[in-house]
């Protein structure tokens, strides 16, 4: 006597399919960059003086505090995070968003790599490592199966 296969769990099947369609590297970029953008947009002086977590990397790089610039950078990051979260879940334009993060991330990394002299050695390593996260994840997003067009 053969038994019928178990009925699919209709409650979890759509959720599992939705998770499989997510471009996970883009989800990670959105989660990684949201706090950065929110702090710069909402608390620009704190962002300038103490980012990240009290280390003061931005202030140490020199230059005068500029509230307008800090808020604009924060809102720009929040805007990119929204576009990233949208595309990670809809798959619409994920390659373009990943490419945008690569351009931003590599340029940001290159600038800071050329201006490490005001930071202690441990902070230099930490800065380069944390700045490398976004372009590495963005490159992974380009290679994600969800970023490729479906084959007929």
Which residues are covered by each model-predicted region?
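Aromatic-anchored segments of alpha-helical transmembrane domains
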Residues: 33-36, 102-113
């Amino acid at each position: 006597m053969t038994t019928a296969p178990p009925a699919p769990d209709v409650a979890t099947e759509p959720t599992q399919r939705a998770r499989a369609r997510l471009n996970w590297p883009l989800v990670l970029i959105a989660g990684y960059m949201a706090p950065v953008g929110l702090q710069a947009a909402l608390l620009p002086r704190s962002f300038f003086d103490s980012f990240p977590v009290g280390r003061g990397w931005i202030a140490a790089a020199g230059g005068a505090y500029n509230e307008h610039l800090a808020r604009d950078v924060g809102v720009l990051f929040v805007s990119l995070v929204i576009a990233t979260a949208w595309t990670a879940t809809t798959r619409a334009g994920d390659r373009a968003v990943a490419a945008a993060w690569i351009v931003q991330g590599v340029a940001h990394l290159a600038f800071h790599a050329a201006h490490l002299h005001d930071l202690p050695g441990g902070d230099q390593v930490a800065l380069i490592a944390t700045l490398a996260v976004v372009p590495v994840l963005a490159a992974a997003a380009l290679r994600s199966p969800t970023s490729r067009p479906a084959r007929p």
